[in-house]
C-alpha cells in the first residue's frame, strides 16, 4: 500500500502546533539572518511576517486557522510586555534623573507623531475614517485598536498602520538617529519607543539595556497618554 502523502500533508498543516512551529521557526531564521548580515531590511519582524504569510498561502491555510493555532503565543504577549519592566527597574535611577525631560519629550514628540501622520493623510485627501484609523499609529496594537474604535476609525486598519509604523521605524530609525548625531542611549530609546512602539523597543534592546529601558518607558507612557488624550482632543476639535 502506497503512503498517503496528501493525507499526511493535510494532517501536518492542520495540526494545532503547525502555526506555532512556523511562527517560531520563521522568527528564529529571520533573527539568524539579521545577526549574520546586519542588513536593516532583514528586520526580524518584517521578514518573519512575510515568511509566515507565504507559508500560509502555499499551504492554503486561512488566517482564522492560523490565529486559532497560535492562540498560546497570543496569551504570552501579556507576560512578554510585563517583562519590559525589567530594564526599566534596572535603570530606574537614571529615569528619575531625567524625569522632566522625559515628560517634555513625550508630550512634544507624541503630539508631533500623532498629528504628522494624520495631517499628511488629510493633505492627500484621505477620508475621515482613514484619518481616525491612522491617528493612533504610534502606540501598541491593542491600545491603537481600542482608540481607533472610540474615535470612529476601523480597528483592524489601525492595527495595520501600527505594524507598518513599527517596522519602518525599526528599520530606518537607528540610521536617522545616527545621521542626526543622536548618540545618547536615553534619547535613542525615547525616539524609538514613541514612534515605533513595541517593534522599536525590541530594536532598542538590541542597542543597549539603557536604550531599551527608555524605549519601554516611552512606549508605555505614549500608550496611556494616547488612550486618554486623543479621544478628548477629537471630541474638542471635531
Predicted regions and their residues:
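Residue-level detector of alpha-helical segments with a strong bias toward transmembrane helices
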Residues: 53, 70, 101, 150, ...
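Helical membrane-embedded segments and adjacent short helical loop/helix-boundary regions
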Residues: 7-23, 27-89, 94-101, 105, ...
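Juxtamembrane helix-boundary/capping and inter-helix hinge elements in multi-pass membrane proteins
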Residues: 38-39, 61, 89-100, 124-129, ...
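Gly/Ser-rich, low-complexity
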Residues: 1-2
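Internal active-site segments that recognize and position negatively charged phosphoryl groups
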Residues: 91-167
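Proline-rich low-complexity regions
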Residues: 44, 87, 135-136, 231
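Transmembrane alpha-helical segments of multi-pass membrane transport proteins and ion-pumping complexes
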Residues: 19-32, 49, 53, 57, ...
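Alpha-helical membrane segments and immediately flanking helix-loop junctions
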Residues: 130-157, 161-165, 183-221
